[in-house]
């Protein structure tokens, strides 16, 4: 989930801008490339968030006890390739969600909305909400596939899907089209607050790093450091919604397609806090940060390089 400084401060020179359609392709491609590297962390985060679901602390087995031991547990149970569970669904989600998000934000930039006070945050939040809605079915399948594992280390409900298409077909057949958007009520605020927080903090964080003169002027290390600092704010506001999203997406449903554990966002928040304590809303926050930091930087790097290529093709010889 990243938007670069170039997007946050729209260029006045048209030669430095690409069309919203191009931004859609570049943004989706960049985030998909980043997803390939960070998906193992997403698998670990998902398992940690489901571990001990609606059980009091200390009353359940803990096959996952931290980042390193969790990676080892996944590799032992599912093989090394198990660390890439749900990758196809993750790529689909990143492509859909970020494609829509970059496209909508680029439209806002072209219209001059981001130059208004608070426009950057509002545009980022709205673009994030729209992207989350479009990508919700892919996130649903990704979560369920990443939760699947052997009985010895299983956490959360096990859906037993055979793959992305099989999962989509099963959900459609059993729950109808609306079933594909089950859990979207938590996904939309999750991406909305994350997108707004990222946009509100990245520029100032990068500027602060540059003011410290730790790196050479225009060094990519300043972008990296700014992104890592910004990621702290993003994880802090996203983590509770992330836990709730994972649980709503993964819970079993009855024949009418209603969740058997939670009635929705608020119900999940209340039940989780009552039975596991408030800190349960930050389960998996370590891997979440370890994933988001690299994902942010990789997305920025890939997006920036792809954008440079697009601008060269758009204005050859300049």
From Swiss-Prot:
It catalyses: a dicarboxylate(in) + sulfate(out) = a dicarboxylate(out) + sulfate(in). The chain crosses the membrane at residues 21-41, 59-79, 112-134, 184-205, 220-240, 292-315. Keywords: Membrane, Mitochondrion, Mitochondrion inner membrane, Repeat, Transmembrane, Transmembrane helix, Transport. It holds the Pfam family Mito_carr. GO terms for cellular component: mitochondrial inner membrane. The keyword Repeat applies. One of its GO terms (biological process) is blastocyst hatching. The keyword Zinc does not apply. It is found in: Mitochondrion inner membrane. InterPro entries: Mito_Carrier_Antiporter, Mitochondrial_sb/sol_carrier, Mt_carrier_dom_sf. Solcar repeats lie at residues 18-111, 115-208, 218-309. It is a multi-pass membrane protein. Its main location: mitochondrion. It comes from the Eukaryota. Putative antiporter that exchanges dicarboxylates and sulfur oxoanions across the inner membrane of mitochondria. Belongs to the mitochondrial carrier (TC 2.A.29) family. PANTHER family: RE38146P, SOLUTE CARRIER FAMILY 25 MEMBER 34. This is Solute carrier family 25 member 34. It comes from Rattus norvegicus (Rat). The lineage of its organism: Eukaryota, Metazoa, Chordata, Craniata, Vertebrata.
């Amino acid at each position: 989930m990243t938007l670069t400084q170039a997007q946050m401060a729209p260029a006045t020179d048209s030669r430095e801008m690409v069309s919203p359609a191009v931004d859609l392709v570049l943004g989706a491609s960049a985030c998909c490339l980043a997803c390939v590297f960070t998906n193992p962390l997403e698998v670990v985060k998902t398992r940690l968030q489901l571990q001990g679901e609606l059980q009091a602390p200390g009353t359940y087995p803990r096959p996952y006890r931290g980042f390193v031991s969790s990676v080892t547990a996944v590799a032992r149970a599912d093989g090394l390739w198990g660390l890439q569970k749900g990758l196809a669904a993750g790529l689909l989600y990143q492509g859909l969600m970020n494609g829509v998000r970059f496209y909508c934000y680029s439209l806002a930039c072209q219209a001059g909305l981001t130059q208004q006070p608070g426009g950057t945050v509002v545009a980022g939040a709205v673009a994030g909400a729209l992207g989350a809605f479009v990508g919700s079915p892919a996130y649903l399948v990704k979560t369920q596939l990443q939760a699947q594992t052997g009985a010895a280390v299983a956490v959360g409900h096990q859906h037993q899907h055979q793959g992305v298409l099989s999962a989509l077909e099963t959900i459609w057949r059993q729950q109808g089209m609306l079933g594909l958007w089950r859990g979207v009520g938590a996904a939309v605020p999750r991406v909305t607050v994350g997108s707004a927080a990222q946009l509100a903090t990245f520029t100032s964080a990068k500027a602060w790093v540059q003011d410290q003169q730790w790196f050479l002027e225009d060094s990519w290390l300043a972008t990296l450091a700014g992104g890592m600092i910004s990621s702290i704010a993003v994880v802090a506001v996203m983590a509770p919604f992330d836990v709730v999203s994972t649980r709503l997406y993964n819970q079993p449903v009855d024949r009418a397609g209603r969740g058997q554990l939670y009635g929705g966002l608020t119900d999940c928040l209340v039940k989780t806090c009552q039975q596991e304590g408030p800190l349960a809303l930050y389960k998996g926050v370590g891997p979440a940060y370890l994933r988001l930091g690299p994902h942010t930087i990789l997305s920025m790097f890939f997006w920036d390089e792809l954008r440079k290529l697009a601008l060269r093709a758009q204005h050859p010889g300049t």
